[in-house]
């Protein structure tokens, strides 16, 4: 019996019919706290990694090796005053950061951490993740409009156009995964990558979707970078043009919520990419299956997050017209072509997803 089963059975005996509600709230709270800690130390890892790429030390003053720097940053932001512009639409101005950060948390309801460990194992998990993650753009638009600033509004318009453009190619990539797996359930998609010729010979990593769906994997991940407005697609908050974009008139914790949502979305994109294309919690080799699945998922997510950071430190920022051209003239045609190719592949005798 697993630890979760033991807790569940003990809680049922202790609280009776109230236990399912209490257990759901406890799991949600634990996941939320873990996500917040991951965001805090992801920011530290980003600063450290970019520092090493720049041949400098990075933050190293607060705590041993700078490990307490995220806590110091949070305390600083908590003590900052939230200043509202005189001409801002007050309620919309305050609601906008919440509308950005809530969907980022909500996506985690359907992401499986290992077999049987998921908050909500619903059959339409993939559709839910795509739909909920698309809501955040409304908060960005409201933030730009409510600030009553031309720079904030320009950043919001850029964000809306960019996020809508790249959601199309991400949607195509998810449709192709759906075609091969035959299910919208994320646990089922991971399970569909655990069988086949290579998996039966212990080479699990060659049976994952990244190999047969490599163009879709590349398109999905790059589109994810654009969706999160990360470098080199960060024209929304281009420091050399419009400073912080839609966040320019925010301060204190209101400003921090936007950054919190950005880094949570980075982890979400990486977790979904690992689940859909890299086998989720599956071990890369059969003889390593004794290691808990959550360890493999965390390792894959950490690798993809490091690629996010590497891209920031390596590539120059794209012009806005180049970003739109990449999304509409390259990614969408590639997705349509590969969608047709995979369709014929599935219908042919060479179908590897049977």
From Swiss-Prot:
Q: Which GO terms describe its molecular function?
A: NADH dehydrogenase activity; oxidoreductase activity, acting on NAD(P)H, quinone or similar compound as acceptor; quinone binding
**UniProt similarity note:** Belongs to the complex I subunit 1 family.
Swiss-Prot/TrEMBL catalytic activity: a quinone + NADH + 5 H(+)(in) = a quinol + NAD(+) + 4 H(+)(out)
Lineage start: Bacteria, Pseudomonadati, Pseudomonadota, Betaproteobacteria, Burkholderiales
Which UniProt keywords are listed? Cell inner membrane, Cell membrane, Membrane, NAD, Quinone, Translocase, Transmembrane, Transmembrane helix, Ubiquinone
Where it mainly occurs, coarsely classed, is membrane
EC primary class: translocase
Name the Enzyme Commission number(s) assigned to this protein.
7.1.1.-
Pfam families membership? NADHdh
Its GO biological process annotations read: aerobic respiration
Record keyword Membrane present = yes
- What compartments host this protein? Cell inner membrane
Q: What top-level branch of life does the organism fall under?
A: Bacteria
**Spans through the membrane:** 25-45, 91-111, 126-146, 170-190, 205-225, 267-287, 290-310, 330-350
Under the subunit heading, UniProt states: NDH-1 is composed of 14 different subunits. Subunits NuoA, H, J, K, L, M, N constitute the membrane sector of the complex.
Tell me what this protein is called: NADH-quinone oxidoreductase subunit H
The protein's matches in InterPro entries, at most eight in alphabetical order, are given as:
NADH_UbQ_OxRdtase_su1/FPO, NADH_UbQ_OxRdtase_su1_CS
């Amino acid at each position: 019996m697993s630890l979760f089963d033991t807790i569940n059975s003990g809680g049922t005996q202790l609280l009776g019919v109230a236990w399912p509600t209490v257990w759901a709230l406890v799991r949600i709270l634990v996941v939320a706290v873990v996500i917040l800690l991951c965001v805090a130390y992801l920011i530290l890892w980003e600063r450290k990694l970019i520092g090493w790429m720049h041949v400098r030390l990075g933050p190293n003053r607060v705590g041993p090796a700078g490990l307490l720097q995220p806590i110091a940053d949070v305390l600083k932001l908590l003590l900052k005053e939230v200043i509202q512009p005189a001409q801002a639409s007050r309620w919309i101005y305050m609601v906008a950061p919440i509308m950005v950060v809530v969907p980022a948390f909500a996506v985690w309801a359907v992401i499986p951490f290992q077999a049987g460990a998921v908050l909500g194992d619903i059959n339409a998990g993939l559709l839910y993740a795509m739909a909920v993650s698309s809501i955040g753009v409304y908060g960005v638009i409201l933030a730009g409009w409510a600030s009553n600033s031309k720079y904030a509004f320009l950043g919001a318009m850029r964000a809306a156009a960019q996020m809508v453009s790249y959601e199309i190619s991400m949607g195509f990539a998810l449709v192709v995964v759906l075609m091969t797996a035959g299910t919208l359930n994320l646990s089922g998609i991971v399970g569909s990558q655990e069988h086949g010729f290579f998996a039966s010979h212990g080479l699990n990593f060659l049976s994952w979707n990244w190999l047969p769906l490599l163009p879709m994997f590349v398109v999905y991940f790059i589109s994810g970078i654009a969706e999160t407005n990360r470098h080199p697609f960060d024209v929304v908050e281009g420091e050399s043009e419009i400073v912080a974009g839609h966040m320019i008139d925010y301060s204190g914790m209101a400003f921090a919520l936007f950054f919190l949502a950005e880094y949570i979305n980075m982890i979400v994109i990486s977790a979904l990419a690992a689940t859909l294309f890299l086998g989720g919690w599956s071990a890369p080799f059969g003889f390593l299956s004794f290691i808990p699945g959550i360890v493999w998922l965390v390792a894959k997510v950490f690798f993809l997050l490091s690629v996010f950071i590497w891209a920031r430190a390596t590539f120059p920022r794209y012009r806005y017209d180049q970003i739109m051209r990449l999304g509409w003239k390259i990614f969408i045609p590639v997705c349509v072509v590969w969608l047709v190719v995979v369709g014929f592949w599935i219908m042919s005798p060479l179908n590897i997803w049977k």
